[in-house]
Amino acid sequence: MKFIVNSTALLRELQKLNGVISSSNTLPILDNFLFNINNNQMSIVASDLETTMMSSISVEADADGKITIPARILIDTLKTFSNQPLTFIVDTNTFGIEMSSELGNYKLAGQNADEFPKIPTLQSSSSTTMKGEVLVNAINKTLFASGNDELRPVMSGVFCELSSEQTTFVATDAHKLVKHSRTDVKSDNTVSFILPKKPLTILKNNIGDDSDVTLEYNETNALFSFGNITIICRLIDGKYPNYEAVIPKENPNKLTIATSTLLSSIKRVSIYANKTTHQIRFKVAGSELQITSEDLDFANKAEERLSCQYEGEDMEIGFNSKFVIDMLNNIGAEQISIEMSAPNRAGIILPLDGMEEGENTLMLVMPVMLINYYEKNNLNFSPYILHNCKYSTKFNSY
């Protein structure tokens, strides 16, 4: 089998797919790309068994056929070429591959394509369509808040809930939570599932803003298709926590401030915070927000005062600065509102601008303990959203 392909075009497609290939594959053949030629169109497949990604490219071929080629050596070679045609000759008996360029020849060992895992197919699936920029925005708003705890796999992805009224994306790691919804993306069926982190990362890196994305799903898999790309992923099995139960409904204390002003201040003050807790303290009184941090081990301390708009009683509350910085970096608004009720209850961050019609984002961050408040009020404290361990769906009352 012989085929000719443009080096730049091939490299562009392989780099898209390379993110799927795992550094610790259980099957050696998964270190390869699957090339399948049919009528001068070559489909390229990469898989790690959980996520499968496919692309296609035009070639000049003397016959149909398929082969798997080692990913790393092929990409490393293609990176060194200028834009030129490359000729591949495949020995269908030994699976040896000879690649020819304008400057020379390169031999590498392929593997039998029949040994490559079968591409998953979706049976009894439903589908919906959304704009690429809508999906990318939803991923950017939520993915950072997902967890990495192997004991709670349902929290390591993004929960997606589709209905006839809206589509909602939710992510949490038990310390922070993000809920992002769109009323302009709907489904005929009411369904929910948990999308893994890896395919979502690949999606946001490859979807163009002007692309239309088709999402197909059933009980075990989800399929995303756009342009010449198809991504199939296995859904995370399990029941997602009742996230609505942890969102405080009564938040009488409301602070309004410019996102960039608050973000810059927190970044500076957090440098002086304890390196384990990353604790910063908000003290709000009148139209002034005081942000402080302290590291007693090294006698470090910082304080800044910012002007803000505030409605409510004077209060103090502690937060993990890393969580707040993550949220402000991803909220996509110039002005935000922080809604609070008490030092031992979650704070809510809401964007006040930058939202499209039908788009809503809510970010929740759990407080960290302020010793003086809890000693004075004789209160217990937990910085976790979840009440208990492995697959619990119960939230704390606060």
Regions found by a protein language model. Give the residues of each.
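Structural preference for solvent-exposed beta-strand-turn elements
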Residues: M1-C389, K394
